[in-house]
Amino acid sequence: MNSESLENLHRPLIESSKSFVDYRLETVLTDRELPYFRRIYLAMMIEMKFLFHLAAPAIFVYVINNGMSILTRIFAGHVGSFELAAASLGNSGFNMFTYGLLLGMGSAVETLCGQAHGAHRYEMLGVYLQRSTVVLILTCLPMSFLFLFSNPILTALGEPEQVATLASVFVYGMIPVIFAYAVNFPIQKFLQSQSIVTPSAYISAATLVIHLILSWIAVYRLGYGLLALSLIHSFSWWIIVVAQIVYIKMSPRCRRTWEGFSWKAFEGLWDFFRLSAASAVMLCLESWYSQILVLLAGLLKNPELALDSLAICMSISAISFMVSVGFNAAASVRVSNELGAGNPRAAAFSTVVTTGVSFLLSVFEAIVVLSWRHVISYAFTDSPAVAEAVADLSPFLAITIVLNGIQPVLSGVAVGCGWQAFVAYVNIGCYYVVGIPVGFVLGFTYDMGAKGIWTGMIGGTLMQTIILVIVTLRTDWDKEVEKASSRLDQWEESREPLLKQ
């Protein structure tokens, strides 16, 4: 073992097309003949190869896809300040609502496909993909009515009439994108569970260029407004979806996991919906949390300034968050694959390494934000008042970025293990019982404004992060391996619920 370890590290990361699990990591971690620090060094070398093979393209994909939303808001801001506020409100109140819900439901595929792939049950991946897509599309049908009635909903919530009217126009053009999400997220998780992430990165990069060109033409050449920008956003997402479908059909890498359309996709839809709902609750409670901050800001004094400054801060936070979400995807894939393959120590080690790297990057990002706090808003608007407000909120933004370097990664570990139901309860308590009420009291009762709202919400995030750290440190990884095997057996036999508290 000692003489071969270094040589093994220079072999290809993935030696066999049968599995994306490297059994050398588990072997190194269990080799007691190696000195402790030598064992950790060799394990780090193996895991870092895996981590950046998965995380780097995933981060790129998430940043690029989120970049389309940010570009849409930037162009809206150059149309007018009310248009920026309306686009931000429409995006936060409706688009991100559906984005979080459907992405959360899609994470059911992440758990099942990841563990099935690690266990070499390749034929089930395509079935899980199709079932999830059917369930998500059916979910989109009633959700589209929320978009159609966005104007009266926003007015009933107390948003200013002019902003609510403009926001509803923006939201109408976003209706096609929710169906794109319903197809994209299962595909995304299907590919990620097989460590296929680079093709999606190329597709997203090409789409971003198309999105930028079309948005520029719409605003500066044709003089169109919010509706055109939101329709272009929807069109861009459908480009991504179609390109990924073509890749799955044509690529030899998906030959064993995609065997064509199957009637099995329509079997057990209710059970799969329940599984997806448990996954959705966990992620939605996280995704909607920051959006509630923007909605509450619309009720403050001078709501236009509050919305503009918070929208810019949330856009910056979203860019940083996408980096953490890339590590979230890597953690989920690594943990689910290793658990499915029966490698408990490798799963635990991957959790530690991924969380540590993500945290260090988030600290660097927070320092950059604080250094550029007086100029960073000018990428979105020319208003000096908004720039001053953004600079004033930058310390809160920096703290949020650091916390987001830890929490999403641990959520990815939870998805890989199938802990979605448990984390959902944690999120309810920390976010909605503690964070939002405290933020509301500080923001409105004590008249601290956006700072008060954000302070309470940071407290909720901190509490949730601490709980997830404690739970992860106390995890019995051998038992998690047993649960992963049992979960796959239960799903194939359709005997018991997949996710237990």
From Swiss-Prot:
Disulfide-bonded cysteines: none
InterPro entries registered for this protein in UniProt: MATE_euk, MATE_fam
Keyword Metal-binding belongs to the record: no
One Gene Ontology CC term in the entry: membrane
UniProt family annotation: Belongs to the multi antimicrobial extrusion (MATE) (TC 2.A.66.1) family.
MF-aspect GO terms: antiporter activity; xenobiotic transmembrane transporter activity
Transmembrane region(s): 44-64, 84-104, 134-154, 163-183, 200-220, 222-242, 280-300, 310-330, 352-372, 396-416, 422-442, 453-473
Pfam families xref list: MatE
Gene that this sequence comes from: DTX37
PANTHER family, A to Z: MULTIDRUG RESISTANCE PROTEIN
Keyword Transmembrane helix attributed: yes
Domain of life of the source: Eukaryota
Protein name: Protein DETOXIFICATION 37
